[in-house]
Amino acid sequence: MSRKESKAPRTRMTAGQTRVLMSFFKDNPFPSTTAREKLSKVLGVGPRTVQIWFQNQRQKARGQAKVSDREEGPRACTGSECLGKLCILACAAISRMEEEAAWNLGH
């Protein structure tokens, strides 16, 4: 069996699934196994898919923090600290506050 044949097909999340996951991610980028299992049941995808989604989002947050640091200077932390759990939580909180402020300005 070739490598391509053994690989599972890519799971595409719907817009609704993504909204639920992003909302949860903003509150808790590091969900417990139990929370991931509950999310997987609600969303109709496997727990491993939810786990990978959260890993990918945390990596994306790290990358965005690095780019932001290069462009604007460090906001919440510097150097290797930006790769840590606290920075991801801080970046998620900042992102949520910015979104809420933008929403409040629009309404």
From Swiss-Prot:
Name of the featured protein: Homeobox protein HD-3
GO molecular function annotations of the record: DNA-binding transcription factor activity, RNA polymerase II-specific; RNA polymerase II cis-regulatory region sequence-specific DNA binding
CDD domains per the UniProt record, alphabetical: homeodomain
This protein's record includes keyword ATP-binding: no
SMART domains in UniProt: HOX
DNA-binding region: 6-65
PANTHER family assigned to the protein according to its UniProt record, in alphabetical order: HOMEOBOX DOMAIN-CONTAINING PROTEIN, HOMEOBOX PROTEIN HHEX
UniProt GO cellular component terms: nucleus
Source organism: Encephalitozoon cuniculi (strain GB-M1)
Biological process terms in GO annotation: cell differentiation
Coiled-coil regions listed: none
